[in-house]
Protein backbone atom coordinates (compact mmCIF):
# COMPACT_ATOMS: atom_id res chain seq x y z
CA UNK A 1 0.00 0.00 0.00
CA UNK A 2 2.81 2.40 0.86
CA UNK A 3 4.45 1.69 -2.51
CA UNK A 4 1.26 2.81 -4.30
CA UNK A 5 1.05 5.93 -2.14
CA UNK A 6 4.64 6.81 -2.99
CA UNK A 7 4.03 6.21 -6.71
CA UNK A 8 0.88 8.32 -6.53
CA UNK A 9 2.75 11.21 -4.90
CA UNK A 10 5.49 10.98 -7.53
CA UNK A 11 2.95 10.97 -10.38
CA UNK A 12 1.03 13.89 -8.88
CA UNK A 13 4.28 15.84 -8.76
CA UNK A 14 5.08 15.00 -12.41
CA UNK A 15 1.67 16.27 -13.58
CA UNK A 16 1.83 19.44 -11.48
CA UNK A 17 -0.52 18.42 -8.67
CA UNK A 18 1.91 18.25 -5.76
CA UNK A 19 0.15 19.76 -2.76
CA UNK A 20 -3.31 18.65 -3.93
CA UNK A 21 -3.10 15.09 -2.62
CA UNK A 22 -5.82 15.62 -0.01
CA UNK A 23 -8.30 17.52 -2.18
CA UNK A 24 -11.64 16.13 -3.31
CA UNK A 25 -12.35 16.01 -7.06
CA UNK A 26 -14.94 18.77 -6.79
CA UNK A 27 -12.22 21.04 -5.39
CA UNK A 28 -10.15 20.69 -8.57
CA UNK A 29 -10.54 22.34 -11.97
CA UNK A 30 -11.40 20.20 -14.99
CA UNK A 31 -7.78 20.11 -16.10
CA UNK A 32 -6.62 19.15 -12.61
CA UNK A 33 -9.25 16.39 -12.47
CA UNK A 34 -7.99 15.05 -15.79
CA UNK A 35 -4.40 15.06 -14.53
CA UNK A 36 -5.53 13.16 -11.43
CA UNK A 37 -7.34 10.63 -13.64
CA UNK A 38 -4.18 10.02 -15.64
CA UNK A 39 -2.25 9.50 -12.38
CA UNK A 40 -4.91 7.12 -11.11
CA UNK A 41 -4.55 5.06 -14.29
CA UNK A 42 -0.74 5.06 -14.24
CA UNK A 43 -0.16 4.34 -10.54
CA UNK A 44 -0.42 0.61 -11.26
CA UNK A 45 2.22 0.92 -14.00
CA UNK A 46 0.09 -0.57 -16.78
CA UNK A 47 1.53 -1.62 -20.11
CA UNK A 48 -1.63 -0.39 -21.86
CA UNK A 49 -3.57 2.81 -21.24
CA UNK A 50 -6.97 3.27 -22.90
CA UNK A 51 -8.08 6.89 -23.16
CA UNK A 52 -11.54 7.67 -24.54
CA UNK A 53 -11.90 11.37 -25.38
CA UNK A 54 -9.76 12.31 -22.36
CA UNK A 55 -9.36 16.00 -23.19
CA UNK A 56 -12.63 16.77 -24.97
CA UNK A 57 -14.21 18.79 -22.15
CA UNK A 58 -11.18 21.02 -21.61
CA UNK A 59 -10.38 24.46 -22.99
CA UNK A 60 -7.83 24.63 -25.82
CA UNK A 61 -4.88 25.76 -23.69
CA UNK A 62 -5.43 23.16 -20.97
CA UNK A 63 -5.97 20.49 -23.62
CA UNK A 64 -2.63 21.22 -25.27
CA UNK A 65 -0.91 21.40 -21.89
CA UNK A 66 -2.22 17.92 -21.08
CA UNK A 67 -1.07 16.62 -24.47
CA UNK A 68 2.42 17.57 -23.31
CA UNK A 69 1.91 15.98 -19.89
CA UNK A 70 0.86 12.73 -21.56
CA UNK A 71 3.76 12.98 -24.02
CA UNK A 72 6.23 13.43 -21.16
CA UNK A 73 4.78 10.57 -19.12
CA UNK A 74 4.95 8.32 -22.18
CA UNK A 75 8.58 9.32 -22.78
CA UNK A 76 9.46 8.37 -19.20
CA UNK A 77 7.43 5.16 -18.88
CA UNK A 78 6.90 3.84 -22.45
CA UNK A 79 3.41 2.38 -22.03
CA UNK A 80 1.13 1.75 -25.00
CA UNK A 81 -1.75 4.19 -25.41
CA UNK A 82 -4.96 3.61 -27.33
CA UNK A 83 -6.46 7.05 -27.71
CA UNK A 84 -10.03 7.42 -28.94
CA UNK A 85 -10.59 10.98 -30.10
CA UNK A 86 -12.44 13.08 -32.64
CA UNK A 87 -9.75 15.77 -32.38
CA UNK A 88 -7.52 15.38 -35.43
CA UNK A 89 -4.75 17.66 -34.14
CA UNK A 90 -4.70 15.70 -30.89
CA UNK A 91 -4.38 12.42 -32.78
CA UNK A 92 -1.61 13.74 -35.02
CA UNK A 93 0.32 15.22 -32.08
CA UNK A 94 0.12 12.24 -29.73
CA UNK A 95 -0.02 9.20 -32.00
CA UNK A 96 2.45 7.13 -33.95
CA UNK A 97 -0.42 5.59 -35.93
CA UNK A 98 -3.94 6.92 -36.52
CA UNK A 99 -6.82 4.66 -37.52
CA UNK A 100 -9.94 6.09 -39.15
CA UNK A 101 -13.09 4.18 -38.36
CA UNK A 102 -16.26 3.65 -40.37
CA UNK A 103 -19.76 4.45 -39.27
CA UNK A 104 -21.61 1.80 -37.30
CA UNK A 105 -20.53 -0.83 -36.95
CA UNK A 106 -17.15 0.77 -36.34
CA UNK A 107 -14.41 -0.79 -38.43
CA UNK A 108 -10.92 0.46 -39.22
CA UNK A 109 -11.01 1.64 -42.83
CA UNK A 110 -7.78 3.62 -43.04
CA UNK A 111 -4.49 3.72 -41.17
CA UNK A 112 -1.98 6.56 -41.24
CA UNK A 113 1.50 6.47 -39.75
CA UNK A 114 2.53 9.74 -38.14
CA UNK A 115 6.16 10.07 -39.12
CA UNK A 116 6.90 13.29 -37.27
CA UNK A 117 10.02 13.14 -35.08
CA UNK A 118 9.71 12.68 -31.31
CA UNK A 119 9.62 14.26 -28.86
CA UNK A 120 7.03 16.54 -30.43
CA UNK A 121 6.79 20.10 -29.21
CA UNK A 122 3.57 22.07 -29.66
CA UNK A 123 5.35 24.13 -32.32
CA UNK A 124 5.10 21.10 -34.62
CA UNK A 125 1.35 21.75 -34.89
CA UNK A 126 2.11 24.85 -36.98
CA UNK A 127 4.38 23.09 -39.47
CA UNK A 128 3.39 22.15 -43.00
CA UNK A 129 3.93 18.39 -42.52
CA UNK A 130 1.67 18.38 -39.45
CA UNK A 131 -1.02 20.44 -41.16
CA UNK A 132 -0.86 18.14 -44.19
CA UNK A 133 -1.43 15.10 -41.97
CA UNK A 134 -4.44 16.74 -40.31
CA UNK A 135 -5.92 17.71 -43.70
CA UNK A 136 -5.37 14.19 -45.06
CA UNK A 137 -7.18 12.67 -42.06
CA UNK A 138 -10.00 15.20 -42.40
CA UNK A 139 -10.44 14.23 -46.07
CA UNK A 140 -10.61 10.53 -45.21
CA UNK A 141 -13.15 11.15 -42.48
CA UNK A 142 -15.16 13.33 -44.86
CA UNK A 143 -15.33 10.44 -47.32
CA UNK A 144 -16.59 8.16 -44.55
CA UNK A 145 -19.23 10.64 -43.42
CA UNK A 146 -20.51 11.18 -46.96
CA UNK A 147 -20.77 7.46 -47.72
Please state what every model-predicted region is.
Residues 103-133:
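Conserved beta-strand-loop-alpha-helix hinge in the C-terminal portion
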Residues 78-84:
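Conserved H-loop
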Residues 23-26, 44:
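Conserved signature/switch motifs of ABC ATPase nucleotide-binding domains
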Residues 29:
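ABC transporter NBD signature
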Residues 49-52:
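Catalytic Walker B motif of ABC-type/P-loop ATPase nucleotide-binding domains
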Residues 2-20, 72:
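Conserved ABC ATPase "signature" region
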Residues 63-77:
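Helical segment within the ABC ATPase nucleotide-binding domain
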Residues 38:
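Hydrophobic anchor residue at the start of the ABC signature
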Amino acid sequence: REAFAERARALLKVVGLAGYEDKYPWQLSGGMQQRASICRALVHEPELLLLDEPFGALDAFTREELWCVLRDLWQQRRFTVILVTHALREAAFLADTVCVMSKRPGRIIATRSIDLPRPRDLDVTYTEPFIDIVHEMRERIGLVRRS
